[in-house]
Amino acid sequence: MTDTRNGEDNGKLLYCSFCGKSQHEVRKLIAGPSVFICDECVDLCNDIIREEVQEAQAESSAHKLPSPKEISGILDQYVIGQERAKKVLAVAVYNHYKRLNQRDKKADDVELGKSNILLIGPTGSGKTLLAETLARLLNVPFTIADATTLTEAGYVGEDVENIIQKLLQKCDYDVEKAQMGIVYIDEIDKISRKSDNPSITRDVSGEGVQQALLKLIEGTVASVPPQGGRKHPQQEFLQVDTRNILFICGGAFSGLEKVIQNRSTKGGIGFNAEVRSKEEGKKVGESLREVEPDDLVKFGLIPEFVGRLPVLATLDELDEAALMQILTEPKNALTKQYAKLFEMEGVDLEFRSDALKSVAKRALERKTGARGLRSILEGVLLDTMYEIPSQSEVSKVVIDESVIEGKSKPLYIYENSEPAAKAAPDA
């Protein structure tokens, strides 16, 4: 029935049949058979439908678990090299979520354990990026924690349960979603025991944190304050079961290769001793591939903690060729990102191959891996990004080796200019 109230001159004042607003209170009133609907109600209906569609898509994608090969293939789009680590991660993550998908089905006598992961590799080799990409691929909540900020409960610093609180924040405190999430704990090697021998002094940021993390990683019900804040007795807590949360720990473990080499090298004295030259020494990545749980214990992790991380994946050091690939090949490659920024100003950005090689060399010298690439490019392009928005006539910027080495300025090519391009003005 048409909703009309109080006549107006020759016509009747029309009202929305859903919210009751008059035609003067809304921008548009759409007529139907004996009903009217305003533009505000149409927008509200669209929002409701959009939310339901997104939830249905998320639910269907959660049930469809990609195979290990598919997981590895997607990782290839973002992470260069590290094939062995990708394979280990793909299998471990696939088995973990396969276990979760089967948990509601008819149980038998076989109980599948959780396979938490330990990533070992040099700085800038892709540990964090691998974990982030996995979480994005699986559409699950993901958070990163820094092990160096953690302390035992009762001491100044972050409590280990703050990790779960961060995970809850990522999914708007939806406990069910959080219990299916992934937690990446970085710098895990920094909480190694300070010495092999137990000390009478309390190690609240080393072995103490390992002890505190044990139950959380293995599986426990953590009490987390709602909406953050510190705990107090009168407060209600959110109960989060961590049994199904996948924990990935990562660290550079600098010096671990020496522990491995000492174990694997058979020493001797006298005429029968084996003499090794320095050239025969293995690269760090090659040594790390031979890591065993006992090596991690000697490094400073307690045996119980090592036992909670049954899946080990090692990452290799990135060489010059790999760094050049990282600059150009991944979906989110740095050269593509900067080219996009310049494109927004209507300018083409070109990196010559010798420039990319020079950037890779400088990153190797800094020993920061892929992490150092952005800071190098940011420094090189700073003046150009400062000038370009004020120079509408520039159509292209060319970066070569001499620019990276600081010997010359980037080459600016102007619209309607002759083939010989002008050099960039001094800053």
Curated annotation (Swiss-Prot):
GO annotations of cellular component type: HslUV protease complex
Keywords per UniProt: ATP-binding, Chaperone, Metal-binding, Nucleotide-binding, Zinc
UniProt cross-references to InterPro entries, sorted A to Z: AAA+_ATPase, ATP-dep_Clp_protease_ClpX, ATPase_AAA_core, Clp_ATPase_C, Clp_protease_ATP-bd_su_ClpX, ClpX_bact, P-loop_NTPase, Znf_CppX_C4
ClpX-type ZB domain ranges (all copies): 4-57
Molecular function GO terms recorded: ATP binding; ATP hydrolysis activity; ATP-dependent protein folding chaperone; protein dimerization activity; unfolded protein binding; zinc ion binding
GO-annotated biological processes: cell division; proteolysis involved in protein catabolic process
Binding annotation for ATP: 122-129
Pfam families in the cross-refs: AAA_2 (PF07724), ClpB_D2-small (PF10431), zf-C4_ClpX (PF06689)
Residues the entry annotates as binding Zn(2+): 16, 19, 38, 41
Claim: Disulfide bond is one of the keywords in the record: no
CDD domains membership: RecA-like_ClpX
Plastid found in the keyword field: no
Function: ATP-dependent specificity component of the Clp protease. It directs the protease to specific substrates. Can perform chaperone functions in the absence of ClpP.
Subunit record text: Component of the ClpX-ClpP complex. Forms a hexameric ring that, in the presence of ATP, binds to fourteen ClpP subunits assembled into a disk-like structure with a central cavity, resembling the structure of eukaryotic proteasomes.
Homology family: Belongs to the ClpX chaperone family.
Protein name from the UniProt record: ATP-dependent Clp protease ATP-binding subunit ClpX
Organism lineage string: Bacteria, Pseudomonadati, Pseudomonadota, Gammaproteobacteria, Pseudomonadales
